Protein backbone atom coordinates (compact mmCIF):
# COMPACT_ATOMS: atom_id res chain seq x y z
CA UNK A 1 0.00 0.00 0.00
CA UNK A 2 1.44 3.37 -1.05
CA UNK A 3 0.26 6.82 0.03
CA UNK A 4 0.82 9.82 -2.23
CA UNK A 5 -0.73 13.26 -2.39
CA UNK A 6 -3.46 12.33 0.07
CA UNK A 7 -4.47 9.29 -2.01
CA UNK A 8 -3.73 5.67 -1.19
CA UNK A 9 -2.74 3.31 -3.98
CA UNK A 10 -3.43 -0.40 -3.67
CA UNK A 11 -1.03 -0.81 -6.57
CA UNK A 12 -0.10 2.02 -8.89
CA UNK A 13 -0.47 0.59 -12.39
CA UNK A 14 -1.24 3.54 -14.64
CA UNK A 15 0.20 7.01 -15.18
CA UNK A 16 -2.00 9.36 -17.20
CA UNK A 17 -0.15 12.23 -18.85
CA UNK A 18 -1.46 15.41 -20.38
CA UNK A 19 0.36 16.06 -23.66
CA UNK A 20 0.99 19.76 -24.35
CA UNK A 21 3.12 21.28 -21.60
CA UNK A 22 3.97 17.89 -20.08
CA UNK A 23 5.43 15.82 -22.92
CA UNK A 24 5.95 18.56 -25.49
CA UNK A 25 6.30 22.32 -25.61
CA UNK A 26 2.96 24.10 -25.53
CA UNK A 27 1.99 27.24 -27.40
CA UNK A 28 -0.80 29.77 -26.84
CA UNK A 29 -1.32 29.50 -30.62
CA UNK A 30 -1.78 25.69 -30.29
CA UNK A 31 0.46 22.94 -31.61
CA UNK A 32 -0.99 22.49 -35.11
CA UNK A 33 1.42 20.20 -36.94
CA UNK A 34 4.12 17.59 -36.45
CA UNK A 35 6.67 20.27 -37.37
CA UNK A 36 5.51 22.32 -34.36
CA UNK A 37 5.60 19.32 -31.99
CA UNK A 38 8.84 19.31 -29.96
CA UNK A 39 9.40 17.09 -26.93
CA UNK A 40 10.35 18.86 -23.72
CA UNK A 41 13.86 18.06 -22.46
CA UNK A 42 13.84 14.79 -20.52
CA UNK A 43 10.14 14.08 -21.06
CA UNK A 44 10.52 11.09 -23.37
CA UNK A 45 13.19 9.61 -21.12
CA UNK A 46 10.81 10.04 -18.16
CA UNK A 47 8.17 8.06 -20.07
CA UNK A 48 10.77 5.34 -20.70
CA UNK A 49 11.52 5.24 -16.96
CA UNK A 50 7.83 4.72 -16.21
CA UNK A 51 7.56 1.94 -18.77
CA UNK A 52 10.74 0.23 -17.51
CA UNK A 53 9.19 0.31 -14.03
CA UNK A 54 6.31 -1.75 -15.43
CA UNK A 55 3.70 1.00 -15.44
CA UNK A 56 1.05 1.62 -18.07
CA UNK A 57 1.45 5.11 -19.59
CA UNK A 58 -1.51 6.76 -21.28
CA UNK A 59 -1.97 10.25 -22.72
CA UNK A 60 -5.20 12.21 -22.06
CA UNK A 61 -5.24 15.52 -23.91
CA UNK A 62 -7.70 18.29 -24.74
CA UNK A 63 -7.22 19.10 -28.44
CA UNK A 64 -9.71 21.90 -29.04
CA UNK A 65 -7.67 23.04 -32.04
CA UNK A 66 -9.61 20.37 -33.93
CA UNK A 67 -12.95 21.82 -32.87
CA UNK A 68 -11.73 25.33 -33.65
CA UNK A 69 -10.69 24.27 -37.15
CA UNK A 70 -7.03 25.17 -36.52
CA UNK A 71 -5.85 21.77 -37.76
CA UNK A 72 -7.29 18.60 -39.21
CA UNK A 73 -7.48 15.11 -37.72
CA UNK A 74 -4.66 13.97 -40.05
CA UNK A 75 -2.39 16.65 -38.54
CA UNK A 76 -3.20 15.37 -35.03
CA UNK A 77 -2.38 11.83 -36.14
CA UNK A 78 0.94 13.07 -37.56
CA UNK A 79 1.77 14.75 -34.23
CA UNK A 80 0.95 11.56 -32.34
CA UNK A 81 2.93 9.49 -34.83
CA UNK A 82 5.98 11.72 -34.29
CA UNK A 83 5.58 11.43 -30.52
CA UNK A 84 5.16 7.64 -30.56
CA UNK A 85 8.12 7.18 -32.93
CA UNK A 86 10.39 9.24 -30.68
CA UNK A 87 9.23 7.29 -27.63
CA UNK A 88 9.72 4.07 -29.60
CA UNK A 89 13.31 5.10 -30.30
CA UNK A 90 13.83 4.63 -26.55
CA UNK A 91 12.55 1.06 -26.74
CA UNK A 92 9.14 1.63 -25.16
CA UNK A 93 5.61 2.46 -26.27
CA UNK A 94 2.65 4.38 -24.94
CA UNK A 95 -0.29 2.21 -23.98
CA UNK A 96 -2.85 4.62 -25.39
CA UNK A 97 -3.64 8.14 -26.51
CA UNK A 98 -7.05 9.58 -25.62
CA UNK A 99 -8.09 13.06 -26.70
CA UNK A 100 -11.05 15.40 -26.69
CA UNK A 101 -11.55 17.34 -29.96
CA UNK A 102 -14.20 19.70 -28.56
CA UNK A 103 -14.05 23.35 -27.58
CA UNK A 104 -15.02 24.44 -24.06
CA UNK A 105 -18.27 25.83 -25.48
CA UNK A 106 -19.35 22.33 -26.56
CA UNK A 107 -19.91 21.35 -22.91
CA UNK A 108 -18.94 17.76 -23.67
CA UNK A 109 -18.24 15.03 -21.12
CA UNK A 110 -14.70 14.35 -22.35
CA UNK A 111 -12.99 17.75 -22.20
CA UNK A 112 -10.99 18.17 -19.00
CA UNK A 113 -11.92 19.23 -16.33
CA UNK A 114 -14.77 16.78 -17.05
CA UNK A 115 -13.80 13.19 -16.29
CA UNK A 116 -14.77 11.54 -19.59
CA UNK A 117 -11.23 10.84 -20.81
CA UNK A 118 -10.19 9.49 -17.41
CA UNK A 119 -13.38 7.41 -17.16
CA UNK A 120 -12.64 5.95 -20.61
CA UNK A 121 -9.09 5.09 -19.59
CA UNK A 122 -10.18 3.44 -16.34
CA UNK A 123 -12.93 1.56 -18.17
CA UNK A 124 -10.63 0.31 -20.91
CA UNK A 125 -8.28 -1.38 -18.44
CA UNK A 126 -10.83 -2.00 -15.63
CA UNK A 127 -8.95 0.29 -13.26
CA UNK A 128 -9.95 1.88 -10.00
CA UNK A 129 -8.93 5.46 -9.23
CA UNK A 130 -6.44 4.20 -6.62
CA UNK A 131 -4.45 2.53 -9.41
CA UNK A 132 -3.87 5.77 -11.32
CA UNK A 133 -2.06 9.08 -11.09
CA UNK A 134 -2.52 12.05 -13.45
CA UNK A 135 0.40 14.33 -14.35
CA UNK A 136 -0.67 17.62 -15.88
CA UNK A 137 0.39 21.20 -16.44
CA UNK A 138 -2.99 22.87 -16.08
CA UNK A 139 -5.62 23.40 -13.39
CA UNK A 140 -8.07 21.54 -15.66
CA UNK A 141 -5.87 18.42 -15.44
CA UNK A 142 -5.87 18.58 -11.63
CA UNK A 143 -9.62 19.30 -11.51
CA UNK A 144 -10.36 16.30 -13.75
CA UNK A 145 -8.15 14.02 -11.66
CA UNK A 146 -9.78 15.15 -8.42
CA UNK A 147 -13.28 14.73 -9.85
CA UNK A 148 -12.36 11.18 -10.92
CA UNK A 149 -10.80 10.38 -7.53
CA UNK A 150 -7.31 10.09 -9.02
CA UNK A 151 -4.14 11.44 -7.38
CA UNK A 152 -2.31 14.09 -9.38
CA UNK A 153 0.95 15.96 -9.81
CA UNK A 154 1.25 19.35 -11.48
CA UNK A 155 4.23 20.35 -13.59
CA UNK A 156 5.52 23.87 -14.22
CA UNK A 157 6.74 23.02 -17.74
CA UNK A 158 3.38 24.18 -19.09
CA UNK A 159 0.67 26.41 -17.63
CA UNK A 160 1.49 26.14 -13.90
CA UNK A 161 3.69 28.93 -12.57
CA UNK A 162 5.32 29.65 -9.22
CA UNK A 163 2.10 31.14 -7.85
CA UNK A 164 0.16 27.89 -8.23
CA UNK A 165 -3.51 27.70 -7.43
CA UNK A 166 -3.75 27.02 -3.69
CA UNK A 167 -6.98 24.98 -4.00
CA UNK A 168 -4.97 21.76 -4.09
CA UNK A 169 -2.78 21.69 -1.02
CA UNK A 170 -2.35 17.92 -1.46
CA UNK A 171 -1.04 18.21 -5.03
CA UNK A 172 2.72 18.39 -5.50
CA UNK A 173 3.80 20.90 -8.14
CA UNK A 174 7.21 20.09 -9.65
CA UNK A 175 9.32 21.47 -12.48
CA UNK A 176 8.70 18.89 -15.21
CA UNK A 177 7.74 15.32 -16.07
CA UNK A 178 11.11 13.95 -15.00
CA UNK A 179 10.70 15.50 -11.53
CA UNK A 180 7.14 14.13 -11.36
CA UNK A 181 8.39 10.63 -12.14
CA UNK A 182 10.97 11.04 -9.37
CA UNK A 183 8.04 11.60 -6.95
CA UNK A 184 6.34 8.31 -7.77
For every predicted segment, state its role.
Residues 10-58:
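Active-site neighborhood of HAD-like aspartate-dependent phosphohydrolases
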Residues 69-84, 109-121:
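Short, electropositive alpha-helical surface patch
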Residues 80-99, 164-184:
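Structural recognition of alpha->loop->beta junctions
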Residues 134-172:
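Acidic, Mg2+-coordinating phosphoryl-transfer loop and its flanking beta/alpha structural elements
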Amino acid sequence: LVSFGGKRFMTLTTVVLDRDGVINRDSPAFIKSAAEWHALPGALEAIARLKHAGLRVVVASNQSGLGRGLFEYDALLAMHDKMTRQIGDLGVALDGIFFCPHTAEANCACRKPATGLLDDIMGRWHLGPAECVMIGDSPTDIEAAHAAGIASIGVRSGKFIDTEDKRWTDVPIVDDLSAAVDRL
